[in-house]
């Protein structure tokens, strides 16, 4: 006979189970998320942050409805991602040795509660009015934050540093670069390392 187990099998339990079976992949890498006022802003923010983290020497993965990759590997996923889909994707990233994953936090990419049992380290946006929606995002996508999270956005310091990058001649891209720098600073990367990467990038361009 096959034993039957009874209990309340809600999304939280499913997330814990899926994360456990996958080996807790979100604990094996830095998890960044980008949200914004529209799809284009989110995609651009994800792309710029990915490029900048790679510039700093990090193996990077990107999870977005516009095209998910784990380093150079294309991940063929069906969007919006559910709880099991997300844990499976993160597991692939962890197996590939990714140091940081960037998630597009929007409804195209994520289904409701898709981030159950996913530890998000940093959440960024270029929309300065979006900070009030942090609790709404937590409720909608159910991500875990192990500290008192606040929304990261561009600062005068990140604006100044971005003005020294190859994005200096493109006002729109400059905003994306400033957000990427602000998020990397918030993650604890030293300013000297950031300035050095920006200088090398500028010289190459």
Where are these regions (language model features)?
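Phosphate-binding loop of NTP-binding sites
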Residues: 16-170, 179-187, 191, 201-205
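Acidic-aromatic/histidine active-site loop/patch
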Residues: 1-4, 17
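Short acidic-hydrophobic, aromatic-tinged amphipathic segments that line or gate anion-handling sites
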Residues: 3-12, 81
